[in-house]
Structure formats: C-alpha cells, structure tokens
C-alpha cells in the first residue's frame, strides 16, 4: 500500500465530505424558500473551504475544568475511525483486501462510540454528558440490528469479503429478495449516524448541541468531518450490500459512475429526510428498535437460515 494510493483514497473523500456539507445547506435553504450559501465563490461553491479556513485558524478554546487529554483525543479519534472505515471498501478495488471486510467495518464503527463518550465526559458539562450517553445508547442499540441484517445478507453472499458481493449481485440486486431488511437497514443507518429524525444526541431545545457543546474551532470541525464522512460511508455500504453494481473489466469507469450515482441518490435521501421529518421522542426511538426491528430482523434471519435447508441447497461458497 503506497502513500499515493492512500492519498488517492483520502483526498476525494475529504472533498466529497466538504461538498456534502454545502449540499445539505443548499437543500435546507431551498426547502425553506431561501437561497442558502451563495456569496463565497460562484453559487457559493467555495463556502466549505472558507468555513475550513475560518475554523482551523481560530483559537481552540478549552474549558478550564475539562480533562485535556481526552478532550483533544476524542475528535482526532472520531476522524481517524471515519477514515479507517473506507480501507476495505471495493470501489471497484479496495485499498486493503480483507477476507473479513464486513466484520472489520462493524467492529471499527463500534469504536466511534468511545470518541463520543470521551468528548461528553471530558468536557465536564452536564449537557455534553447527557448528549454523549444518549448517543452511545442509541449507537450501541442500533448496531444490534445492523449486525443481524448483515448476517442475513452474508448468508446469501457466502463470504465476509465485500468484493464477493459484486459477484453475488451480477444478475439480481439483493434489495429485491431482502427488501424488508433493506428498509430496516436504511432506517438503522440514519440512527447510527445520529441524523434526523434520530438526532436526539444534539436536541437543540434541551441539550443545545449535545456532546460537542464545549468544542470550538478545529476540534469541532473534526467532529463534523467525521459525521459527514460516516454518512457517505454508510450510503456506500448500503449501495454495495443491496444495490450492487456489476463490474466489467473492459469498462471499469462504468462501475465507478453507477456506484457513485447510487451513493449520491441515497445521500440526497438522507438530506431530504432531514428537511422533511421532525425529531422522535427518545422512548419512541428505543421502542422502534427493541420492540419492532429486533424481533423482525431475528425472524427474517431464521427464515434466511432455514430456507436453503428447506429447499435442500446451500449458499454459494465463494
């Protein structure tokens, strides 16, 4: 793995993340009958870079009562994990070809909980701590359904390797035979990334800004960068699992174009949901998971396990 390969992966992700922030502000603006950012550069296209310059040149203030080490480590860890999640994704070739790529993504995304918990605790603020506890409970809860849904799709894929998902979906998207799982997966990714209508961790009316309330300047920017990278990564993963694109060695650029288009459409749906839906109550959020999603996903998992046995066949051993 050369440095050039690493840069060719990281730089486009950072650019995509910057323009996702701008796109969200534009969509929010137009949905509220206003223009959104339109001053810096043509049509406001340079706004993300202006924001980055402003945030990274400001003085990073630290509360005098905070635990400095964890306070600084938390945003850095959040961004590192957000970037690390991209390494096994085949687009069409992965940076690191892991046999257990899906397991790596699931395990690494669980580590993001620590950055949220540390930031809430180290800030020494009640608002930040309550926001962090909410975010951690929500993230851990929804990872249960994400893991079960992944296991169900892996039974049809026959491997933990993400590259084999491309071969599995050559003739049929997994979205069609597993559409209930796909719907629950998409809603769970909204909760996993703390997006509306599941953004209880940063409820402005009761918690001001949630776990990052005491952060300013560069560290705050790192949290936002990690959040938007996770959104793109989750939609990329959704595209791979349920909307697989057939790879043709003679025209690899066609795979990339189709892949990016599907990911962009799913990301736009994330933003559209933010503009259209109000926030859930916290008890409704937890009931949706433990009383609805968990029994449903377990029942469907049993169905996908028993079905090959019933029809006397086995999943493809790729």
Swiss-Prot record:
Protein topology in the membrane: Multi-pass membrane protein
UniProt KW keywords: Electron transport, Membrane, Mitochondrion, Mitochondrion inner membrane, NAD, Respiratory chain, Translocase, Transmembrane, Transmembrane helix, Transport, Ubiquinone
Membrane-crossing segments per the record: 3-23, 68-88, 100-120, 146-166, 171-191, 213-233, 253-273, 285-305
Major site of localization recorded for this protein: mitochondrion
Listed GO biological process terms: aerobic respiration; mitochondrial electron transport, NADH to ubiquinone; mitochondrial respiratory chain complex I assembly
Highest taxon above the source species: Eukaryota
EC number: 7.1.1.2
A Pfam entry, by short name: NADHdh
Record localization: Mitochondrion inner membrane
Function: Core subunit of the mitochondrial membrane respiratory chain NADH dehydrogenase (Complex I) which catalyzes electron transfer from NADH through the respiratory chain, using ubiquinone as an electron acceptor. Essential for the catalytic activity and assembly of complex I.
Protein name, as recorded: NADH-ubiquinone oxidoreductase chain 1
Organism of derivation: Gorilla gorilla gorilla (Western lowland gorilla)
């Amino acid at each position: 793995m050369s440095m050039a390969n690493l840069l060719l992966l990281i730089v486009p992700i950072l650019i995509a993340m910057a323009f996702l922030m701008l796109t969200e502000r534009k969509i929010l603006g137009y949905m509220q009958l206003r223009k959104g950012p339109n001053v810096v550069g043509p049509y406001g296209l340079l706004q993300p870079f202006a924001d980055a310059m402003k945030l990274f040149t400001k003085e990073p203030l630290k509360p005098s009562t905070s635990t400095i080490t964890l306070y600084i480590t938390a945003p850095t860890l959040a961004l590192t994990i957000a970037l690390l999640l991209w390494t096994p994704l085949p687009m069409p070739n992965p940076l690191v070809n892991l046999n257990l790529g899906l397991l790596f993504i699931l395990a690494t995304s669980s580590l993001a909980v620590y950055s949220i918990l540390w930031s809430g605790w180290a800030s020494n603020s009640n608002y930040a701590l309550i926001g962090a506890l909410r975010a951690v409970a929500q993230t851990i809860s929804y990872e249960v359904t994400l893991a079960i849904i992944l296991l169900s799709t892996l039974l049809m894929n026959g491997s933990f390797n993400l590259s084999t998902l491309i071969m599995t979906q050559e003739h049929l998207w997994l979205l069609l035979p597993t559409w209930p799982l796909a719907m629950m997966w998409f809603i769970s990714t909204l909760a996993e990334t703390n997006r509306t209508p599941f953004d209880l961790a940063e409820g402005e009316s009761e918690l001001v800004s949630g776990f990052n309330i005491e952060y300013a300047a560069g560290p705050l920017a790192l949290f936002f960068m990690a959040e938007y990278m996770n959104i793109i990564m989750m939609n990329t993963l959704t595209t791979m699992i349920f909307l697989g694109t057939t790879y043709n060695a003679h025209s690899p650029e066609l795979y990339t174009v189709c892949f990016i288009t599907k990911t962009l459409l799913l990301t736009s749906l994330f933003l559209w949901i933010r503009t259209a839906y109000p926030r859930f109550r916290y008890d409704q959020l937890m009931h949706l998971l433990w009383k609805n999603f968990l029994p449903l996903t377990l029942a469907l998992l049993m169905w996908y396990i028993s079905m090959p046995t019933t029809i006397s066949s086995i999943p493809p051993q790729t």
